[in-house]
Regions:
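Conserved, single-site charged/polar hotspot
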Residues: 1-300
Length: 300
């Protein structure tokens, strides 16, 4: 790691804080999020996006205090959205919660530093403001609106786009039947590739361990699912009997889902809490359908 190391006592734990320049930070980020062997233009684009995101968060922290995650809880709904929660003593953390930052050992090609030098100081802006640039490794063929995923703020530059060479016709993915057809299909999206040469060029080894990231499925017996949901969000539904889509975003991602158990029925959202609720870690996406057969819930 570059820079200086600061150790502080934070709530009876020691916290290590790495103090370094923006560009040294980005040197690690763009080779931790993606691989240092990625093409030059890919690395340049990543540098601009990651620089923009970081500066937007720092600027936001100057004006917004308290938590960056919010709740709306009543007897019928549990709605939560996450963002970069307020790190009181540092700007960003070192994992996917903010951006991956794994030190300079990942930046083992000259192309990484060259990409930073070529884009030094460059950011994305919209109407004079630095963009809150978000990114993912695989969008499943279509991206979602910012306000459907995070806080209810509309950013016109973060809207639905299709990830394809030409405008891929998806239909209205807010419609359940259209979304179902889309989710069960394999459209010709850029991120739909099994080419090992491409994947090994742009993904670090730990990301290549995931084989089925474009379309996937996971199954749970009802008893296991009920225990998992109780453990993840602390709400006792009893035995879960049904999971129903209530609202989907423009990309088909679920924003609100109704869980029906023999003790309780509740609607949960937004996107990330849905993904966390139905997985030990998190589902790859909330663009899924649920099928039930013989007491087994299968998420596609």
């Amino acid at each position: 790691f570059k820079g200086k190391l600061k150790i502080i006592d934070e709530q009876k734990h020691l916290t290590a804080i790495n103090i370094l320049s923006l560009e040294d930070y980005l040197l690690s980020v763009i080779s931790s999020e993606m691989r240092a062997t990625s093409s030059a233009e890919f690395l340049k684009a990543h540098a601009v996006i990651s620089r923009s995101w970081l500066l937007a968060q720092i600027d936001k922290a100057k004006t917004v205090r308290g938590t960056y995650s919010s709740y709306r809880v009543d007897q019928d709904e549990y709605i939560r959205w996450y963002d970069r929660e307020d790190h009181a003593h540092f700007d960003v953390c070192a994992d996917d919660h903010c951006q991956r930052y794994q030190g300079i050992s990942k930046a083992y090609t000259p192309a990484v530093r060259e990409a930073l030098e070529a884009t030094r100081g460059e950011v994305l802006t919209y109407e004079g403001t630095i963009c809150d640039a978000r990114f993912s490794k695989c969008c499943g063929g279509a991206t979602e609106r910012f306000d459907n995923t995070w806080e209810p703020v509309v950013h016109p530059y973060l809207d639905k786009i299709t990830d394809a060479p030409e405008d891929l016709e998806t239909g209205d993915l807010r419609n359940e039947q259209t979304a179902r057809k889309w989710i069960l299909s394999f459209p010709p999206a850029f991120c739909h590739t099994t080419d090992r040469q491409i994947l090994s060029q742009v993904l670090n080894d730990y990301d290549q361990e995931t084989q089925h990231f474009f379309r996937w499925q996971v199954s749970y017996p009802a008893e296991q699912l009920s225990e998992l949901v109780y453990r993840k969000i602390g709400i006792d539904f009893g035995t879960i009997r049904d999971i129903q889509p209530i609202e989907r975003g423009v990309s088909g991602r679920l924003i609100r889902v109704k869980i029906t158990g023999d003790k309780k029925t509740l609607v949960i959202g937004k996107e990330l809490i849905i993904r966390k609720t139905f997985s030990e870690s998190h589902l790859y996406s909330s663009a899924f359908i649920v099928e039930k057969q013989d007491g087994i819930f299968t998420f596609h």
